[in-house]
Swiss-Prot record:
Residues 1-159 form the Obg domain. One of its GO terms (biological process) is ribosome biogenesis. SUPFAM superfamilies: Obg GTP-binding protein N-terminal domain, P-loop containing nucleoside triphosphate hydrolases. Residues 160-333 form the OBG-type G domain. Residues 128-148 are annotated as: Disordered. This is GTPase Obg. One of its GO terms (cellular component) is cytoplasm. Keywords: Cytoplasm, GTP-binding, Hydrolase, Magnesium, Metal-binding, Nucleotide-binding. It is found in: Cytoplasm. GTP binds at residues 166-173, 191-195, 213-216, 283-286, 314-316. The gene is obg.
Length: 398
């Protein structure tokens, strides 16, 4: 299945049914009076979060949706049937943006959660409604109102507590395989990971967190190099970032430079995201000479002037991964406990997430516009959609 994490759609609620103009006509009943019924309300449009979905691909090929109109009223004071609501399933983690106002319309973060995105039109009134002591034969009715119309943009961001950062082949996917039951593809060539992978890390019976691995970044990613930075937006919901660096890179590069490359790209993408709690993971220490591990790891930390937590691991051999998982769990539980006890802390976190999401959208749109201008300058088709030529992948949420 193709992984699609953005889709523009247009939705239109149903029109309300018109009220009926009718008078009672019955044998032996003279001047029976008005009996025109009201119309039915138009159907509304709802988005419904579904945990069984993990892509927005269906909305890429079918972008227009309309709910049912309400039926018109009838004689004998019969009310028209209400139009059926239209329920559109979307993956959990979908953000809804009004494209006309560029405001966030809502966020679907729990299975079964509903969000009304277009209100159905109000029913029209039949002439029965207008009878009075001075108007026994009303001929007035009202039409049903139009349903709401909206142009929306759906953005899917995976729901994870912890996000992985690093260059291609740093060992991020191997780490997720080591600490969870997820089985992302692992190989000795760059860009093995093409879409976000999720894994659930169970520290104890009732203690667990979700970790996300995104495609690796390279220098210039913020300008579109490699797979670009489009997947960085999936980290905006994460409470902790794990910055993994290969301590024995096959290309002979300097681990310190590799850490700085990612930090620079993160800063360019979203300054708020770059200020997230970030732990440094020195991976592949099993490939270093035993007598050099201590000195080389210390040298990297010193040159970086790193003040945050540092961990030495071997994702392939599962060395240090269990201890790290426990410390991550403790860190997350402390955050969650603070937010339960302090509403201000929760409000501040939501503000940060909204700021990161806004910065991510702005940067991604800037890159798309730059690529569009480059295509126009080269005389290429302006209708080209880069997502139509994206890779075909299997995306599984474990």
């Amino acid at each position: 299945m193709k992984f699609v994490d953005e889709a523009p759609i247009s939705v239109e609620a149903g029109k309300g049914g018109n009220g009926a103009l009718s008078f009672r006509k019955e044998k032996f009943v003279a001047k029976g009076g008005p009996d025109g019924g009201d119309g039915g309300d138009g159907g509304s449009v709802f988005l419904v979060a579904d945990e069984n979905l993990n892509t927005l691909i269906d909305y890429r090929f079918q972008p227009k949706y309309r709910a049912e109109d309400g039926e018109k009223g009838a004689s004998k004071n019969c009310t028209g049937a209400k139009g059926d609501d239209l329920l559109l399933p979307v993956p959990v983690g979908t953000t809804v943006i009004d494209m006309d106002t560029e405001e966030v319309f809502g966020d679907l973060t729990e299975h079964g959660q509903r969000l009304k995105v277009a209100q159905g039109g109000f029913h029209g009134l039949g002439n029965t409604r207008f009878k009075s002591s001075t108007n026994r034969v009303p001929r007035k009715t009202t039409p049903g109102t139009e349903g709401e119309k909206r142009n929306l943009k759906l953005e899917l961001k995976v729901l994870a507590d912890v996000g992985m950062l690093g260059l291609p082949n740093a060992g991020k996917s191997s780490f997720i395989r080591a600490v969870s039951s997820a089985k992302p593809k692992v190989a000795d060539y760059p860009f093995t990971t093409l879409v976000p992978n999720l894994g659930v890390v169970k520290v104890q019976q009732h203690r667990s967190f979700v970790i996300a691995d995104i495609p690796g970044l390279i220098e210039g990613a913020s300008e579109g190099a490699g797979l670009g930075v489009r997947f960085l937006k999936h980290l905006t919901r994460c409470r902790l970032l794990l910055h993994m660096v290969d301590m024995a890179p096959v290309d002979g590069s300097n681990p310190v430079d590799n850490v700085r490359v990612i930090a620079n790209e993160l800063q360019k993408f979203s300054p708020t995201l770059s200020n997230r709690d970030r732990w440094l993971l020195l991976n592949k220490i099993d490939l270093l000479p035993i007598d050099e591990v201590e000195a080389r790891c210390a040298a990297v930390v010193k040159e970086l002037e790193w003040t945050g937590p540092v961990f030495r691991v071997s994702a392939l051999k599962h060395e240090g991964t269990a201890e790290l998982s426990g410390k991550i769990m403790d860190h997350l539980e402390a955050i969650w406990e603070e937010e339960r006890e302090n509403p201000d802390a929760r409000a501040l976190e939501l503000e940060r997430q909204n700021q990161m999401a806004a910065e991510a959208r702005e940067r991604i749109e800037e890159l798309r516009e730059a690529r569009r201008q480059a295509r126009l300058a080269a005389g290429e088709d302006d209708d080209f959609n880069e997502d139509d030529y994206d890779v075909e992948v299997i995306y599984v949420n474990y």
